[in-house]
Amino acid sequence: MHILVVGLDYKTAPVEIREQLSFEPSELGTAMSKLKEEKSILENIVISTCNRTEIYAVVDQLHTGRFYIKRFLADWFGLEKEDVSPYLKFYENDGAVEHLFRVACGLDSMVIGETQILGQVRSSFKVAQEEKTIGTVFNYLFKQAVTVAKRSHAETDIASNAVSVSYAAVELAKKIFGRLSDKHVLILGAGKMGELAAQNLQGQGIGQVTVINRTYEKAKELAGRFSGEPKSLNQLEKTLSEADILISSTGAKQFVITKEMVESANKKRKGRPLFMVDIAVPRDLDPAISEVEGAFLYDIDDLEGIVAANLKERRAVAEQVELLIEAEIVEFKQWLNTLGVVPVISALREKALTIQADTMQSIERKLPNLTHREMKLLNKHTKSIINQMLKDPILKAKEIAAEPNAEEKLLLFKEIFDLQVEDEEQKVEPVQVEQGSFQLFKPNMAQGFATVASE
C-alpha cells in the first residue's frame, strides 16, 4: 500500500493544457467513483482548481497506480496518454503527504498563503466521503491536512495580506491605467473569483462596475453589494463597447467572448483600448482576441510577475509553516505505524474474550443454580479482569510498532501469546526513511516514504 499523487499545475502546464484537464465541480463525484473501479486504486480524491488538477490515491503498487491514473486522465478528457504525460508530476508516500499539506496551507499556490484552496480541498474531501471513495488512510490524512492548514492560518501570518489571483488582475489593470477612479470595469461571472475582483476594485476606488452573469439574479446580488450595475448575458456585446476593463471568470466550457465579438465592439469604441484579464480555467476569452487592434488580452499565467513580488515578502512566514508541516508529517507517520499493530491487538483481544466466554459457559454448566443477576455480575467482573490484564500488553505492542526492530518484536509478541493474525495484508513491513538511519513500520508499505518522483 502506497500514497500517490499524480497531477499537473501552473508550474508544469500552461493554461491551454490545464483547461483541457480540468474537472467541473459537478463531475468530481462521478470521476472519483469511476477512478475507484480502476485496478490498483484503493482510495482516491480528485482536486481540480484553476491552477491545478491532482489525483490523490492510495494504491497497492506504485507503478500500476501511476499507469492506471494516467490512463484514467487521458480517457476522461479524450486524450492520448502520451499527450498528458509530459505535464504530469508525481509524489510518492512522504512526498505525497508533504505535498498535500503544502497545498492545503497555500504554500504550493501561485499566490502564497491564499485561503481559497483550503475550501477546495475540503469540498473534494466531502465529495469523496459522500461517494465512499476513501477509507481509513485518507479519512485521517485529509482531516489532518485541514487541521494543519487551520493551524498555519492561526499561528502564522501566512494568510495575512495574501494577494489573490483576482487581486493580481486588478493590480495589473492599475499598472496599465494608473488610476481606476475614472474607469468602467465589466466583471463577467458572479462566482468567488468575480466577488474577489469586485472587492479589490472597490478598494481601488473604481469609477463604475458592471456585473454580467449567466444567471441575472446572481449578477444582481453581487452588483448590489459593491454599488455596481447588473446586466443580463444578452447585453454582453453592448457592454464590451462601453467598458475599459474586463475581468472574466465564468467557468464555462467554451469561449464566452470571441474575436468577432471584440471586433464588433471595437467599431464603437472610437480607438479606446480594451484591457481584458481572463482568470478562468478553462479560458473564457478566445486567444485570437489578442490580434484585434486596441485589445490587450492577459490570461491567468500572465499574472505571475505580480504574484512574484508578493512572494518575496512571504518567504519568511512560509518557513514557519514548513516547520508546522514537518511536525504534522511525523505525526501522520506515527499514526500510520500504529495500523500495523491493529490486527495483532485485535487478535489478542479476540483470544482473551474467547477464553472469557468459554469460562462463563463452563461456570454456567457447573453452577446451574446461579441466578441471571449473579451470572451477569460474573460476566462483568471476568471481563474487567481481562481488560486489566490486556492493558499493559496492548500499550507495549503500540510502543513496539514505533521501534526500529518492530517486525521482529511483534513476531515474538505473537508467539508469546500464540496469536493467529488472519489479515496478512495488514502485516507490518519495514520502511526505510531517507532522513536519518532509522526505520519506520507500517502496514504493507514496503517501499517506504519516498520524495517527489519524476517520470
Swiss-Prot record:
Top EC class of this enzyme: oxidoreductase
CDD domains registered for this protein in UniProt: NAD_bind_Glutamyl_tRNA_reduct
Miscellaneous comment as given in the Swiss-Prot or TrEMBL entry: During catalysis, the active site Cys acts as a nucleophile attacking the alpha-carbonyl group of tRNA-bound glutamate with the formation of a thioester intermediate between enzyme and glutamate, and the concomitant release of tRNA(Glu). The thioester intermediate is finally reduced by direct hydride transfer from NADPH, to form the product GSA.
Pfam family, one: Shikimate_DH
Record-annotated site: Important for activity: 99
Family: Belongs to the glutamyl-tRNA reductase family.
Superkingdom classification of source: Bacteria
Enzyme Commission number(s): 1.2.1.70
NCBIfam families (UniProt xref): hemA, PRK00045.1-3
Entry keyword set: NADP, Oxidoreductase, Porphyrin biosynthesis
Name recorded for this polypeptide: Glutamyl-tRNA reductase
Record text on subunit structure and interactions: Homodimer.
Catalytic activity: (S)-4-amino-5-oxopentanoate + tRNA(Glu) + NADP(+) = L-glutamyl-tRNA(Glu) + NADPH + H(+)
Domain-related comment: Possesses an unusual extended V-shaped dimeric structure with each monomer consisting of three distinct domains arranged along a curved 'spinal' alpha-helix. The N-terminal catalytic domain specifically recognizes the glutamate moiety of the substrate. The second domain is the NADPH-binding domain, and the third C-terminal domain is responsible for dimerization.
Binding site for substrate: 49-52, 109, 114-116, 120
Active site: 50 (nucleophile)
Pathway(s) of this molecule: Porphyrin-containing compound metabolism; protoporphyrin-IX biosynthesis; 5-aminolevulinate from L-glutamyl-tRNA(Glu): step 1/2
Function: Catalyzes the NADPH-dependent reduction of glutamyl-tRNA(Glu) to glutamate 1-semialdehyde (GSA).
Annotated NADP(+) binding sites: 189-194
One Gene Ontology term of the molecular function aspect: glutamyl-tRNA reductase activity
InterPro entries: 4pyrrol_synth_GluRdtase (IPR000343), 4pyrrol_synth_GluRdtase_dimer (IPR015896), 4pyrrol_synth_GluRdtase_N (IPR015895), GluRdtase_CS (IPR018214), GluRdtase_dimer_dom_sf (IPR036453), GluRdtase_N_sf (IPR036343), NAD(P)-bd_dom_sf (IPR036291), Shikm_DH/Glu-tRNA_Rdtase (IPR006151)
An individual GO BP term: protoporphyrinogen IX biosynthetic process from glutamate
